[in-house]
Every structure is written in C-alpha cells, then in structure tokens.
Amino acid sequence: MRKLACIFALALALPARAAEQKPQDVLPTTPFKEGDTISYADVDKLKDYLPPQFWENREFFFYEGMQLTVGPTERKYGTSDAYAAATEKHKGEAKLGEDGSLQNYQGGRPFPNETIDCKGDPNAGVKIIWNFNKAWNGSGGNAAWSYTYWDRGEQLPLYYEGTSRTVQLAHHVEPQYAENDGDIFPNEKRLGAFGIEVEAPFDARGILVLTYRYKSADGALKEAKNDDTWVFVPDLRRVRRISSAQRTDSVQGTDFTMDDLRSFSGIPPQYKWQCLGEKTVIAPVNTKTLAYPYTDTYNFGPYGFSYASDRWEVRDAWIVRFIPKNEDHPYHHKDIYIDKDTYEPLYSFAYDRKNELWKIIWHNHRYSEDWNGKVNKDPKAADGVWYPGWEGVDQPKNLRTVSDIIVNVQTGTGNRIEFWNNEGSPLSTKGKIRAYIDIGRLNKGR
C-alpha cells in the first residue's frame, strides 16, 4: 500500500496554466538586469525579492558554485489565442456561489485581473485561486516523470519513474468543441481524467492508475462528488477502486500530501481563501536547462532541492492563504505565491497545526514558444519542438510547470518530481481519448 499511496499522489500531481496586459506596464525598479549572473557571493541581492520564509531557509537552495542567470523582468507570456478569446467572450459571466464555489463558468479566465481588489474585496483570494485552477494548461498534460526522495543531499532508496497523462474533458476553448459547450463528449459530468503508468522500479512496474474529477467538485460542498480512482496492480492481476477522499493525508514515505503538488491541486471550496497582498519576486520561471527525462546532469545543488543554477525572472505575484475548513487537516494554513500573468505557482509555505513552518514547495517552468524550431528537430535542442500546436491552437503559448520540489524544513528531507517534457497537446482522436480514460484499459494491464 505504501507504493500505491506514493503512486496515487503522483497521478494527481503530474501534468496535471493568460493574462490581461496593462495598457502601459511600468516595470519595477530592481537591482537586476537581463543577462546578469548571480553567484553565491551575491545572493544578498535576492533577499528583498524572495518570500521571507524562503530566505530564512536559503541553505537548502543556494550554494557555492551556483550560477543564477537573470532573465527578463515581467515578461508577458500570455496564452493561446483561443483561451484569450474565451476569456473575452465569457467575461463577467463567472460568479462565486456557496462555499466559494464557481458558478456559470464556461471557459477562459473566470475573473479578469483588473476586477480583483486584494485590499478591498474579501473574495479576492478565492477569485485568484479559481483563476489558478482554470488557467491555460493546453489540453491537459503528457509527460515522462521521475520521483526521488532526499535527506540533506543523500538520495534515499524510494523512487519511481513512469509516464502520465491528463485529459481535459470540459471547458475546452478550441472552436471545434463549441457545439458541446466546451465538452469533448455530450452530457459530460467529468472535468478531466488523470492516468499514470509506472515503469520503475521493477517491483512496481506495470502499476496503472486512473482518476476522474467531476464537474460537481467546482460547486458547493453539499453537491460535490469526490474523485474516483482505480488502480491496477500486476501482482494481484485485478483493478482495485481506492478512496481518494483523504487527499490531505501525508503520503507514506514522502513529505507531501496529494494536495501539495503544483502547490495546490485540491478542491477550492474545501478551504477559506484570503488575499494577503502582492509582491514583486524573483523566481525560476522559464528554464534554460533540461533535466529528466532528457538528461541527469541538471545541477540541483548539494541538498538536491535547488534550481539556483538556472534562469530566474522578476515577476509580479499574488499571495494567497488557504485555511482548511476541515479541522482534521494537517495544516494550520498555507501561503501560495501565484504569478499574476500566467497563474503558475512560484512558491508556497505550509504550516503545521502549531502554526510553525513545515514545508517549502517551489517549482520550475518551461515555455512552449521558446522551443519552437522545426518539428523534426531533437526536442532536447534549444530550438527543438517539444510542444506542438493542434487543431484550434496553432501556438500553445503555454508556460508549464516541469518540476516540483517539496522540502520539509523541520527534518531536512524532501521530494523532487521532474517532468521536463511536460506538454499539453491532446490525443489525436476522440477514439483514443475514450480508450485512454476507459477503466477497461486498466483491466488489460496497459
């Protein structure tokens, strides 16, 4: 069951999001300029542009020999034209309902940035998290992944490798789905399906997981349906249905819960949300160096938890806090830094029931249009296509999470999940989609 718990968490986490531009953006004054290199001797320059909790635990992340490259300030990554059009078409339609639920949502960004008043609107926090939840993410996700467990620089034996796919079933913005109101199939009740296939280690090889999340999860708690999850275990040669209701339980052998991945992968109405403010931060946003599955030469630092030898950018971020409505939740609260342009997660900080800092979670990202050379080029090349367009989306224009790192600051242990080839193009036909999300696929063990 320990293996299944870890793998189930990964199934929910892995590829498992466009923003309005201000008419005249005024860039903040910072000590950084594009092309600068920051070494360990210079890290004090970063202090005012990092979350204080991150700076106080910087020994996990900054190290002798690091070479941090400064990228552009507040680059506008945008989104696909189709997502931007859906945002404009449905502007003003989405509303908040009971329990902070999302009502009347059809597609695109639910709440335009210019309508969010962090200081004056008590609902600003929940609006931000819905924008995060519904941000542009292509047609889902597809990746090869690696999961490793670390203890202050020592890689522990627990590890997994495999592939995963997220299939978005509702709220599509491509024109071909307009007749079904954005759904792939008529009368669809699911938001999406999430699958994972384990390839290593040998004793876990062949495990398959499939999870459904339902549209009702966006609604009031009294109407919400929990995720359904099935797992195929080769040793048992049968499919088991497992409970996914306890998403907040710590996964055995790890330092995170299922809802920790991507900083937050839970169900928003199960939490109270606050907007704590806005901050200009520097963060690893658009990697210039590849890692798993392309190579094992990425420098994660002496603790195995660092992106310091990569490209970082100055970004404007929302800071939101969730407070669990469930008194049995392991967290007192969590603070999440969310990029205001892309709604990608930057940093988050989870506090235990004693209100003491417990975990730091941060991420790296990769932008589709910076790797847009010839389709037949090696995707490992700097101009090699790894994320092509598809019908209705010629250019994905998608900044995607390609790695999650979770650090338990109380023990020095942590987890690293790498999926650098994460991309959001869909399966080529509805038939292939049906086959992938069919529970019967698990019975066949493939």
Name each model feature, range by range.
Residues T211-A217, H333-Y347:
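A short, surface-exposed beta-strand/turn
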Residues C6-R17:
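Hydrophobic h-region of N-terminal signal peptides that target proteins for export
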Residues Y160-A200, L261-I336, L346:
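Extended beta-strand-rich segments in extracellular/periplasmic secretory proteins, especially
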Residues A19-I116, L236, R247-A283, T287-Y307, ...:
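Non-transmembrane domains of secretory- and envelope-associated proteins
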Residues R205-L208, K225-N226, H329-K334, L346, ...:
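Short, surface-exposed coil-to-beta transition loops
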Residues E20-N226, V233:
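Solvent-exposed N-terminal domain segments of exported/luminal and surface proteins
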Residues M1-L4:
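Positively charged n-region of N-terminal signal peptides that target proteins for export
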